[in-house]
Amino acid sequence: MTVKYNQNGELTMDGISLKTIAQSFGTPTIVYDELQIREQMRRYHRAFKDSGLKYNISYASKAFTCIQMVKLVAEEDLQLDVVSEGELYTALEAGFEPSRIHFHGNNKTKHEIRYALENNIGYFVIDSLEEIELIDRYANDTVQVVLRVNPGVEAHTHEFIQTGQEDSKFGLSIQYGLAKKAIDKVQQSKHLKLKGVHCHIGSQIEGTEAFIETAKIVLRWLKEQGIQVELLNLGGGFGIKYVEGDESFPIESGIKDITDAIKSEIKVLGIDAPEIGIEPGRSIVGEAGVTLYEVGTIKEIPEINKYVSIDGGMSDHIRTALYDAKYQALLVNRNEEADDSVTIAGKLCESGDIIIKDAKLPSSVKRGDYLAILSTGAYHYSMASNYNQMQKPSVFFLKDGKAREVIKRQSLRQLIINDTK
């Protein structure tokens, strides 16, 4: 866990009192343990170096991105996965090397394709037959592409974040021949060069079995097609711990199991080992982030429920409403026994604006207290909205006892900056 209580009973991160952060900078605020982010990246590097295989690790921008996050990614020698013009723009503004950027997405617009080509990104991840034609049409020079294929593997996770099954808006089906058609179209194109294949079977996956099965299916399929590729990218989806009972993906042993299986399979198939790519996002930043809120109204309905309302909600914490995701809350300003079961509710005008049902908190919780919601580093700020004209929160990186603001709190003026009068 990235937080702990100090001798004064205050919750801390990297030795910094989160009560002090909340009082100094306001709430809602998202704080990250910068050293934990870096260590997660380094753990992946070490695990792959031990495998002896050529590899690349790309950070999935969609989990959380901003200029300072991109700079951190560059410092730790990761590549970058983007899925929109905005994510690409952010990366370029941060000074990230374009050749180390990969552009994903099931519906890249003509403008996005041109923008990526103009900036000489590393490669496109092809998601449809039509996209092959579009990129070839707008390219003037050789363009590296990777085909996103669907191996037909269903990861055991929430149906909204499964992506490797046949019925998916993402990728090209192996079973139904779309992947083979894509290879043929790339080979017949004027400007495109096939660099490799990519697959992403889902998110919040705790074990290795689905990744191993996927790798074997794709390697065998490539062998059947008589194709040797430079890169086999297994995507991301490595799970993290949100609540007690969850298990984080075991990076060291997990990568070893996956790479051992790949080495064994390529030996059986008699093919050269491709470079192995992965795209972690959640597992890099998820557990390193915590959201701070101030407690407001407390409403107790006798024998039914007790609602503890906070000054944020689904505008900065949508995953509970979207996926029925589970979280843990801690009282920031006092270390007391969590002897009460409550519902932590957001302040937005939606009955579904619930952060945690059956949250365990001290019965003494009152207006003006601060709460920390753990493991909110991924898909929180990046999925934040201005619903109810709520302002997006500020974001800080904490390191060596100091708080560094990496995203300023959205101002009221910024809420209407694009409105016409």
Curated annotation (Swiss-Prot):
Q: According to the record, what happens upon gene knockout?
A: Disruption of this gene does not affect growth in rich organic media but reduces the level of methicillin resistance by nearly 100-fold.
Which InterPro entries does the protein's record reference?
Ala_racemase/Decarboxylase_C, DAP_deCOOHase_LysA, De-COase2_C, De-COase2_CS, De-COase2_N, Orn/DAP/Arg_de-COase, PLP-binding_barrel
Could you say which cofactors this protein requires? Answer: pyridoxal 5'-phosphate
What EC number(s) does this enzyme carry? 4.1.1.20
Q: Which residues form a coiled coil?
A: none
**For binding pyridoxal 5'-phosphate, which residues are annotated in this chain's numbering?**
G237, E279, P280, G281, R282, Y379
Q: Which residues bind substrate?
A: R282, R319, Y323, E350, Y379
Keywords for this entry?
Answer: Amino-acid biosynthesis, Antibiotic resistance, Decarboxylase, Lyase, Lysine biosynthesis, Pyridoxal phosphate
One matching Pfam family = Orn_DAP_Arg_deC
Q: In which pathway does it act?
A: Amino-acid biosynthesis; L-lysine biosynthesis via DAP pathway; L-lysine from DL-2,6-diaminopimelate: step 1/1
| SUPFAM superfamilies, alphabetized | Alanine racemase C-terminal domain-like (SSF50621), PLP-binding barrel (SSF51419)
Q: Where are the N6-(pyridoxal phosphate)lysine modifications?
A: K62
What superkingdom does the record give? Bacteria
Tell me which positions the record assigns to the signal sequence.
none
**Which GO BP terms sit in this record?**
lysine biosynthetic process via diaminopimelate; response to antibiotic
Q: Name the reaction it catalyses.
A: meso-2,6-diaminopimelate + H(+) = L-lysine + CO2
Which enzyme class, named as a word?
A: lyase
Question: Which GO molecular function terms does the record list?
Answer: diaminopimelate decarboxylase activity; pyridoxal phosphate binding
Q: Where is the active site?
A: C349
Query: PANTHER family attached here?
Result: DIAMINOPIMELATE DECARBOXYLASE (PTHR43727), GROUP IV DECARBOXYLASE (PTHR43727:SF2)
State its role: Specifically catalyzes the decarboxylation of meso-diaminopimelate (meso-DAP) to L-lysine. Plays a role in beta-lactam antibiotic resistance.
Q: Which family does it belong to?
A: Belongs to the Orn/Lys/Arg decarboxylase class-II family. LysA subfamily.
Complex formation: Homodimer.
Name of the protein in question: Diaminopimelate decarboxylase
Please report the organism this UniProt entry assigns to the protein. Answer: Staphylococcus aureus (strain COL)
Gene, per the UniProt record: lysA
